[in-house]
Design a protein with these regions (language model features):
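Flexible phosphate-sensing "switch/lid" loops adjacent to ATP/NTP-binding sites
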Residues: 1-325, 333-349, 356-357, 363-370, ...
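A generic structural signal for well-ordered coil/turn residues at beta-strand boundaries
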Residues: 3, 206, 233, 291, ...
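Active-site proximal loops enriched in glycine and acidic residues that flank catalytic Cys/His/Asp
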Residues: 11, 41, 214, 241, ...
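Cysteine-nucleophile active-site neighborhood
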Residues: 17-20, 24-28, 32, 343-438, ...
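Short beta-alpha connecting loops at secondary-structure transitions
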Residues: 57-65, 243-247, 352, 373-379, ...
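Glycine-rich, charge-decorated loop segments at or immediately adjacent to ligand/cofactor-binding or catalytic sites
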Residues: 182-189, 386-395, 496
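C-terminal and late-domain segments of enzyme folds
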Residues: 434-438, 442-535
Length: 535
């Protein structure tokens, strides 16, 4: 393709309709046709990034390979397409305004009055086109967070309007709306969609494709009505019914011709429809799995999206082990020595989840003690790894006051300590150890046999690390340090070889698990949990 084409995905009526899944599905379908694609997310909030946002409000913070803290939708982009994202794939209003203000302070605008139009909108447009220009992508898919009509989205909508005018057929808007079903009347209502499209048209944007989220199947007469009232071609009105799995969405979208509609509207040749072979094989294997394995997630956040990547990674691993993974959430705040046996009863494996702060950590330590002493397969991730280290120090090494400097600055047995380069940092946002770092695995260790190689790269998001001063004591007592960063000499992985599966990673392996390439640690963990269930 001579020129990069741009697809803008917007949403209307209500939030949380699944724009991220639709964007990922479009990317997957175009990728299957041989196009070079990327997906980016523009969030209208004023935070610089989601790194300091409450997981209860916004779900997990996803980390890119180059260390950008981003929205969880970037996790969907990577899991669907297998393409790694970077800082350029995530943008917020905060970053846009900061860039413009920094330029103004530098004198780049030569004394002009800085306004939303053109300066903010120009900066948005520059960032939209940045990836296409730099990497010569065939398609850049840009998801706009929020809902049409939100006051904070206005500059993004104006930027899209301008880009559609400037780029002509090389730009298209895909608008996702909701068609509610009124149970009392027994009717599906299209009026909210009509109003949403009118709102979009009022800012100068005509959607090229409409996707209707619905709980009930939409008959042809409803689709014709929407097409007529919204000035959209009938073959460009697509319905997105609720499905058992988000991974069925690309197949459903292909069946209705979403990719062909986009290509036709943008003047691209249609060609043969891809078979989506490996993707369909994954779905077939997933649907044929009848047996289940029970995995408990021990953490302090009740919102499911707070552990989105872990849940999806377990799901991938279950499929490749021909099992469905039944996930039980166990709130670590309410976990005690008295109730841990009851709370973890019937669980074939336990993940001790990441997090920050004091709240809920003693419950995680209780869980780590129970799973270690009862030989239940256990996977500690980030803070979870730190908790299994603290539990071991308290109950095996005999340091009853062992702790992390994060929780107790005065503990004499600081088995988890703050990294040297973090000691003088006061800002919270974007200052942790972030992104991919190299790790060298100890030959003969369980993790070495799982990865089947010595050198790996995994993504991090933390300030605290295993304290090397205690390494000899830990290893003498049976907890081995089996993964280490060669540059900083930081311990990245610990394991207890004498147990079925007791591994802690300071990094977040869940960020690198995709549909077609599940993460080896999760695959082996679930495999061991299945074996544990059978025994």
């Amino acid at each position: 393709m001579a020129e990069t084409k741009y697809i803008f995905v917007t949403g209307g009526v209500v939030s949380s309709l699944g724009k991220g899944i639709i964007s990922s599905s479009i990317g997957k379908l175009l990728q299957a046709r041989g196009y070079n694609i990327t997906i980016q997310k523009f969030d209208p909030y004023i935070n610089i990034d989601p790194g300091t946002l409450n997981p209860y409000e916004h779900g997990e913070c996803y980390v890119t390979v180059d260390g950008m803290e981003t929205d969880l939708d970037l996790g969907h982009y990577e899991r669907f397409t297998g393409i790694q994202t970077t800082k350029a794939n995530s943008l917020t209003t905060g970053r846009i305004y900061k860039a413009v203000i920094d330029k103004e302070r530098h004198g780049d605008y030569l004394g002009k009055t800085i306004q939303v139009v053109p300066h903010i909108t120009d900066e948005i447009k520059r960032n939209v086109k940045l990836l296409g220009k730099k990497y010569h992508y065939d398609f850049v898919i840009t998801e706009i967070g929020g809902t049409i009509g939100d006051i904070e989205s206005a500059p993004f909508m104006e930027a899209i309007r301008q880009l559609k005018w400037e780029l002509g057929k090389n730009a298209i808007n895909v608008h996702l709306t909701y068609v509610p079903y009124l149970r009392a009347a027994g009717e599906l209502k299209t009026k909210p969609t009509q109003h949403s499209v009118k709102e979009l048209q009022s800012v100068g944007i005509q959607p090229g494709v409409l996707i209707l989220r619905t709980e009930k199947h939409l008959e042809q007469d409803i689709l014709k009505k929407v097409a007529s009232f919204c000035n959209v071609d009938l073959d460009c009105v697509i319905q997105s019914e609720d499905l058992p799995s988000i991974y069925e969405v690309p197949v459903n979208m292909q069946k209705q011709g979403l990719d062909t509609a986009i290509l036709r509207k943008m003047g691209e040749p249609i060609g043969e429809t891809p078979t989506l072979g490996p993707w369909r094989e994954f779905l077939d294997r997933r649907n044929k799995a009848t047996e289940t394995v029970n995995i408990a997630l021990v953490g302090k956040y009740d919102l499911q999206d707070a552990y989105k990547s872990i849940r999806e990674s377990l799901s991938h691993a279950g499929t490749y082990n021909d099992h469905k993974v039944n996930i039980k959430f166990v709130n670590s705040e309410h976990l005690t020595d008295d109730n841990v046996a009851e709370k973890l009863a019937g669980q074939d494996g336990v993940v001790i989840c990441p997090g920050f702060g004091q709240r809920g950590i003693e419950g995680k330590i209780v869980a780590a003690h129970y799973t270690r002493t009862h030989d239940i397969p256990t996977f500690g991730i980030c803070l979870g790894m730190q908790m299994i280290v603290i539990e071991f120090a308290r109950n095996v090494l005999g340091y009853a006051d062992a702790n992390s400097r994060e929780m107790d600055e005065k503990t004499p047995h600081n088995v988890i300590d703050i990294m040297e380069e973090q000691k003088n940092i006061t800002n919270m946002g974007g200052t942790m150890r972030l992104g991919a770092y190299e790790c060298v695995l100890k030959q003969g260790s369980r993790v070495f046999n799982i990865y089947k190689k010595e050198h790996i790269q995994e993504r991090h998001r933390h300030r605290y690390e295993f304290n090397n001063d205690f390494q000899k004591e830990f290893e003498k007592a049976g907890m081995m340090c089996v993964g280490r960063n060669p540059e900083s000499d930081l311990v990245e992985i610990v394991e207890i070889p004498g147990l079925k599966w007791y591994i802690g990673t300071q990094f977040h392996p869940e960020y690198q698990s995709t549909v077609l390439h599940p993460h080896p640690l999760f695959v082996d963990f679930v495999k061991t949990a299945i074996e544990n269930k059978k025994k």
